[in-house]
């Protein structure tokens, strides 16, 4: 059986944790930040866990994660 290919776009966006969950960046922290509060920007810097309903699709894109 040939090796499975990793989706490179997904590999750049998601990171697997030790427990098998996936971490992702939060949206809305790229540009247009002037009107956003420091508290919100600080919160948007943190990583979020991918929802369990989306994790299966991420797992298929990252077979070796």
Swiss-Prot record:
SUPFAM superfamilies: L35p-like. GO terms for biological process: translation. GO terms for molecular function: structural constituent of ribosome. The keyword Ribosomal protein applies. GO terms for cellular component: cytosolic large ribosomal subunit. It holds the Pfam family Ribosomal_L35p. Keywords: Ribonucleoprotein, Ribosomal protein. Belongs to the bacterial ribosomal protein bL35 family. This is Large ribosomal subunit protein bL35. The lineage of its organism: Bacteria, Bacillati, Cyanobacteriota, Cyanophyceae, Synechococcales. The gene is rpmI.
């Amino acid at each position: 059986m040939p090796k499975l290919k990793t989706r490179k776009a997904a590999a750049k966006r998601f990171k697997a944790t030790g427990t098998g969950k996936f971490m992702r960046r939060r949206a809305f922290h790229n540009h247009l930040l002037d009107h956003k509060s420091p508290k919100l920007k600080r919160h948007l810097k943190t990583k979020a866990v991918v929802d369990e309903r989306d994790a299966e699709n991420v797992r298929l894109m990252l077979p070796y994660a």
